C-alpha cells in the first residue's frame, strides 16, 4: 500500500498544483474521480495488466473516459500510461482529496459508535474536535455494534478510543501482563 502511495504522490501533487493554479480544483476532483472509477473497472484492470503499448493503452483509456476529462487530464493519463501507472489512479484521487483538505484547512474525522448519534451529539463532537485540532472538521459517521457502547474517533493519526470494547481490550492487556 505504501508503495502505491509513493508512486501516486507525484501525479496527485502535479494534478493538484495545476488545478489550484487554474482555479479548477472541483473540476479536477470530478475528473480524477471518474478516471479512478474507470481504472477500478474489472475489464479495464485486466487491460491495464496486459501487454499493450503505453500509447495504445492511453488512447483506449482516454476513449473510455470520453468527454468526462479535458485535454489537461488527458495529458496526465498519457504520462501515467507511459510510466505504467494508470492502475494507481484511485490512490491519486485519494491523495488529491487529502491535498485539497489541507488547502481548505479541513480534516476528515471518522466517528464510530454502536448506535446512531443525535444531531446535538454530532455538533458537540465537531466543536470539540475543531477546538482540539484548530481546523474545521468534516464528520463521517459509522455504526459498528462491536463497539458495544461509547465511540471511537479517528482524525488522521489521532485515535480517541472511548468505546467499551477498547476499555475491555486495555483491561485484558493489563490483566495479562
From Swiss-Prot:
Record localization: Cell inner membrane
PANTHER family listed in its UniProt record: ATP SYNTHASE DELTA CHAIN
GO cellular component, one term: proton-transporting ATP synthase complex
Subunit structure: F-type ATPases have 2 components, F(1) - the catalytic core - and F(0) - the membrane proton channel. F(1) has five subunits: alpha(3), beta(3), gamma(1), delta(1), epsilon(1). F(0) has three main subunits: a(1), b(2) and c(10-14). The alpha and beta chains form an alternating ring which encloses part of the gamma chain. F(1) is attached to F(0) by a central stalk formed by the gamma and epsilon chains, while a peripheral stalk is formed by the delta and b chains.
Protein role: F(1)F(0) ATP synthase produces ATP from ADP in the presence of a proton or sodium gradient. F-type ATPases consist of two structural domains, F(1) containing the extramembraneous catalytic core and F(0) containing the membrane proton channel, linked together by a central stalk and a peripheral stalk. During catalysis, ATP synthesis in the catalytic domain of F(1) is coupled via a rotary mechanism of the central stalk subunits to proton translocation. This protein is part of the stalk that links CF(0) to CF(1). It either transmits conformational changes from CF(0) to CF(1) or is implicated in proton conduction.
Record bears the keyword Ubl conjugation: no
Primary location recorded for the protein, binned into one broad class: membrane
Pfam families assigned to the protein according to its UniProt record, in alphabetical order: OSCP
SUPFAM superfamilies: N-terminal domain of the delta subunit of the F1F0-ATP synthase
GO function term, MF aspect, one: proton-transporting ATP synthase activity, rotational mechanism
Protein name as catalogued: ATP synthase subunit delta
Superkingdom of origin organism: Bacteria
Annotated source species: Proteus mirabilis (strain HI4320)
Family: Belongs to the ATPase delta chain family.
Entry keywords, A to Z: ATP synthesis, Cell inner membrane, Cell membrane, CF(1), Hydrogen ion transport, Ion transport, Membrane, Transport
Topology in the lipid bilayer: Peripheral membrane protein
Amino acid at each position: 500500500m505504501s508503495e502505491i502511495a509513493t508512486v501516486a504522490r507525484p501525479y496527485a501533487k502535479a494534478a493538484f498544483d495545476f488545478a489550484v493554479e487554474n482555479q479548477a480544483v472541483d473540476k479536477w476532483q470530478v475528473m480524477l474521480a471518474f478516471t479512478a472509477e474507470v481504472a477500478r473497472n474489472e475489464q479495464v484492470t485486466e487491460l491495464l495488466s496486459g501487454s499493450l503499448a503505453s500509447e495504445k493503452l492511453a488512447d483506449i483509456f482516454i476513449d473510455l473516459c470520453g468527454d468526462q476529462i479535458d485535454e489537461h487530464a488527458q495529458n496526465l493519463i498519457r504520462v501515467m500510461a507511459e510510466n505504467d501507472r494508470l492502475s494507481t489512479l484511485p490512490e491519486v484521487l485519494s491523495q488529491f482529496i487529502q491535498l485539497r483538505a489541507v488547502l481548505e484547512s479541513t480534516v476528515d474525522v471518522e466517528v464510530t459508535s454502536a448506535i446512531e448519534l443525535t444531531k446535538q451529539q454530532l455538533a458537540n463532537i465537531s466543536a470539540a474536535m475543531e477546538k482540539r485540532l484548530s481546523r474545521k472538521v468534516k464528520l463521517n459517521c459509522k455504526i459498528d455494534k462491536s463497539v458495544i457502547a461509547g465511540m471511537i474517533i479517528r482524525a488522521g493519526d489521532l485515535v480517541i478510543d472511548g468505546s467499551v470494547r477498547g476499555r475491555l481490550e486495555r483491561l485484558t492487556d493489563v490483566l495479562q501482563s
